[in-house]
Amino acid sequence: MTVRPGHHRCREEVHGTLVQRGDLAGREYASYLVSEQLGWGVIPRTLLRDGPFGPGMVQRWVDTPDRHADDTGGLDLVDICAPDAVPEGWFEILRATDMDGEPVALIHADDPRLQRMAVLDVLINNADRKGGHALEGLDGSVYGVDHGICLHTENKLRTVLWGWAGTEVPGALVVDIDELISSLEGDFGTRLGEHITSDEVAALYERAVDLLAAPVMPRPNGHRPIPWPAF
């Protein structure tokens, strides 16, 4: 279980629980609701709860395989390796140097489960998709965690998942985005407004409409496109 407390902003009662619209916990929960509304299941089950330090959120813990155990050479879906050791079919996002001054490459797999997460990040305007926030569960699903600074009205997309930049969004995901737009025009938009501001709900709607009209993944804009640290 992961626990994240709320922080002050627009305190109000929602379904019997005191939450703060627009706080970290509210954004975590709203991001989870968007993932569920799309039917993608990217974000582990997330609930709002009152805890010993006040209102916040709890999230199902995700156990992951240790692909680096015993020096077997396995790679996580997002990882680093020597520049000359990038596996065939993987995306190289950037090159850097490690603490010993040796060159390394930041890479991620060309995996449809990870691609779905990247599309979700565009929709919820994720400003902090680090490599360590993409978890391959023991159940075979890929989960995203840490969405407390998503859903801002301004473009703040910052991610390590740039491998699909400039490519078309898969058709099945486009259908889901279309259905999300319809739901935002109705009760789901109202429900989200209990946890984020009305301007943020409107911005989510516009991002979805824009992506539906031109279903192509964005490219880095040159202004801090990678979170730091990257993991």
Task: Annotate the PLM regions.
Residues R21, G137-F231:
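C-terminal catalytic region of ATP-dependent kinase domains
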Residues V34-L38, V62, G132, W164, ...:
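Generic structural signal for bulky hydrophobic/aromatic residues embedded
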Residues T2, T17, I43-T46, T64, ...:
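Residue-identity detector for threonine
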Residues H7-H8, H15, H68, H108, ...:
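Histidine (H) residue identity feature
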Residues Q37-W40, L94-L157, L204:
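Conserved kinase catalytic-core segment
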Residues M1-T2, T17, P52, D70-T72, ...:
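Intrinsic structural disorder
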Residues P52-L123, G163-T167, G171, V175-A202:
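ATP-dependent phospho-/nucleotidyl transfer catalytic cores
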Residues M1-E88, V119-A127, L138-Y143:
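Conserved ATP-binding subdomain of kinase catalytic cores across diverse folds
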